[in-house]
């Protein structure tokens, strides 16, 4: 996703197929971007050099207060030296509906399904003590409620339940987000403050019984979990506090503090990549299958400031510092038998981004 030469990012045909309640409905076929809700499960991944796209068909109707989308697609995999092509082993589809009871308020209900025909899912151990890799078919039911009341009270809630088949196991997994905040509209710098708790299930006993690791599908991985690009919405618990300030009409700043833990000590710490780039939704960053490394990932501070220079130009500056917890100091990375404290240090991220829109 960091290197991709000249290619077709979007290439589709769109046809008006219906007119309902004075609003048209369309069928779009071809290569296209998709973004729904808070981008926890489906996102264009705007942070990466190559935005995420899908090949397939999507029918949608958007009205005054209600939107409905239905789609069947395959994720496009960036190719450095060849034209990008969809992953023919993955079929991803679903239905996403949104109701807006008032301005700035959203209620979503959705069903998503991902099917991978490749033997990439590590399932349960067989009688020969070999972990069986197989295909997977995962369905997700979810709901989201987000918005504000009179530009003061803020809320953001989302819950997701997953079920299906994972290699030679069945899946029962879930995730939720609870967020409450308040916006001080008439105070200097218009500050707003949030408290969030994010949870995504992990497998309590990997390789045995039921598969319990949540699959984050195709998320905006960078935007969540301290924006340090190390953690995904799988086997994780994140209590975080956020503050936003509008220093001037064109300068916005955000500060975050995160307390991060694994949900299951025996399951892995997963990255933010998404199902199109990692077979399990997120690449395994570290794992202690004994559970002795514990669950303390660490704490992270993050700051960003956006300068909106004009209608077309923005400059974004950000910094994050991860204070490594005991888990990072003790759990090995894939291919390592063990890890020493000297190998696991605090992590930092600093970035400057210029964007031009036309």
Where on the chain are the PLM-derived regions?
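Signature for the C-terminal beta-barrel architecture of outer-membrane proteins
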Residues: 17, 21-27, 41-207, 246, ...
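Outer-membrane beta-barrel signature, preferentially recognizing the C-terminal barrel domain
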Residues: 89-92, 134, 221-246
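Hydrophobic, well-ordered secondary-structure elements that form the walls
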Residues: 195, 241-243, 255, 303-305, ...
